[in-house]
Amino acid sequence: SFAECMADALPLRETAARVGVSLYTAWFMRMRVCEVMALRTPDCRPGTFHVDGTLVMGSLKGNLGRSGILGLPRPRHRNGRDGRRASRGRSKEWVVVECGVNELGDCFCDVCGRGSAGAGELSVELAARIPAGSAVVTDGHKSYGFAARGYRHAEVDARDPSSGDINMVNALHSRLKAFLRRFNGVSTRRLQRYLDWFRYAEAFKGGGMDGRERLFMHEAEGRYWKTRRLTHLECGDAMVYWTRQIADMSTVV
């Protein structure tokens, strides 16, 4: 069944062949199930959260014409290598994924801007994901001093082991990158859906129920809000940069 394919994180072509549907239908079913996963993942419980961001290379893969985005606002990348070579550091072509995890295993992973997340973006993110009364442990990035002001906040210095560590979130980053590598690149405008999928898998990985059975139950009971048309028009904050680039190119021409 499709739930089994999603639980095993199979590629789209293999999923379509196993379920007996077209590649497009398999893709849309995946988007629908990701929507259910986002709604079914429990909120984080209070605790001590290790928080840090990681960078994911921006990707324009997919049928951009369906969303009204015409043309590429940059030279085409070959296997992702050209983009990494030309966009080292905190380039706007990198998407910030802000992550946090506590000692209970509760975690969050959300798109949080491009290049480098600002204090305002981080404040909104932490307030939305971390319950009141929790403690937050971060690195020395100055934006966290403002963003975590509503929590008990501790900073660690990577050069001083005695100041503590943020190993829990570093391990979460590794698992997230391994998860995304299965798909050979994820479109930036769909990235949050895949982050929701990863968070769902993390939330239920230690449960007694079989993951396939649980996902099938959640699919059957879930509600879907996005139609096919709305899914194609989905853009997301991380794509605003590219739409502006395209607009600027059109103005120059």
What are these regions (language model features)?
Residues 1-253:
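Residue-level recognition of single "structural anchor" positions
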